Swiss-Prot record:
Gene Ontology MF terms: small ribosomal subunit rRNA binding; structural constituent of ribosome
DNA-binding among keywords: no
Functional description taken from the UniProt entry: Binds together with bS18 to 16S ribosomal RNA.
Alphabetically ordered keywords of this record: Ribonucleoprotein, Ribosomal protein, RNA-binding, rRNA-binding
GO biological processes: translation
The protein, known as: Small ribosomal subunit protein bS6
Gene symbol of the encoding locus: rpsF
Family: Belongs to the bacterial ribosomal protein bS6 family.
One Gene Ontology CC term in the entry: ribosome
PANTHER family: MITOCHONDRIAL 28S RIBOSOMAL PROTEIN S6, SMALL RIBOSOMAL SUBUNIT PROTEIN BS6M
InterPro entries on file: Ribosomal_bS6, Ribosomal_bS6_sf, Ribosomal_S6_plastid/chlpt, Transl_elong_EF1B/ribsomal_bS6
């Protein structure tokens, strides 16, 4: 298994953030990814509007999963309407 950082940006609305972050955690666990750490970075103004939102809540996950699962997770995360954007980055050991 490799280690990855997943930066996820959710809507600034509290209820949408809680719903979305719970769904992302569940999605990671369903796909055999182990969440090593989770950091709530906070709410920030976006550099440019995403899905008509000017502010977003950032959540950083450090996950361990098989390399083949990242593409599948990326595709499933793109389909989530409550997630403004996300980025997977492989962490070098």
């Amino acid at each position: 298994m490799r280690t990855y950082e997943l930066m996820a940006v959710f809507s600034a609305h509290e209820d949408l953030f809680l719903q979305g972050s719970t769904a992302v955690r569940a999605l990671l666990q369903e796909n055999d990814a182990v969440i090593a750490r989770e950091d709530h970075i906070g709410e920030r103004e976006l550099a440019y509007p995403l899905k008509k939102q000017k502010r977003g809540r950032y959540l950083l996950f450090i996950v361990q999963c098989e390399p083949g699962k990242v593409r599948e997770l990326d595709h499933k995360l793109r389909l989530r309407h409550d997630l403004l954007t996300h980025l997977f980055v492989r962490v070098d050991s």
